[in-house]
Design a protein with these regions (language model features):
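Short acidic/polar alpha-helix capping motifs at helix-coil junctions
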Residues: 1-4, 15, 26, 39-41, ...
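Residues at alpha-helix boundaries and the short loops/turns that link adjacent helices
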Residues: 12, 65-68, 85
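Short conserved AdoMet
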Residues: 30, 57, 83
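Glycine-rich beta-strand-turn "strand-cap" elements at beta-sheet edges
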Residues: 39-48, 76-98
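Short, well-ordered beta-strand segments in beta-rich or mixed alpha/beta enzyme
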Residues: 2-9, 39-66
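Anionic, Ser/Thr-rich low-complexity intrinsically disordered regions
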Residues: 2-4, 34, 38, 67, ...
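Non-catalytic surface loops within mature trypsin-like serine protease
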Residues: 10-12, 58, 92-95
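Short amphipathic alpha-helical segments
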Residues: 14-37, 70-75
């Protein structure tokens, strides 16, 4: 299992619309095959910056999601809200303490 982190920065005027869209689509994204967890974070000092953390069983499952109609439609709309280029990382968790 690995974590996909995506950093997105939005024009202020689009933040509410992005959050509404995420609220509407989050369960569909989370229910994608291989997705084990989905989280959305907002930067505390710059409210235009958001991060998604999604936990995936394997690379194949993430790629299958990224090629799905769900992803294509959500990403096409999300891209219109950006004020900067998004960044994404696939990372392996090394240590987790509770």
């Amino acid at each position: 299992m690995f974590v996909r982190i995506v950093k997105m920065s939005f024009h202020s005027k689009h933040i509410k619309e992005f959050q509404e869209m995420f609220e509407e689509k989050k369960q569909f994204i989370r229910n994608s095959y291989g997705c084990k967890l989905l989280e959305l974070y907002q930067d505390k000092t710059n409210p235009e910056v958001f991060f998604t953390y999604s936990y995936w069983e394997n690379d194949h499952d993430l790629e299958k999601y990224r090629n799905s109609e769900l992803f294509k439609s959500v990403w096409a709309k999300t891209k219109t809200f950006f004020n900067d280029k998004p960044q994404a990382w696939s990372v392996d968790k090394k240590i987790s303490l509770k």
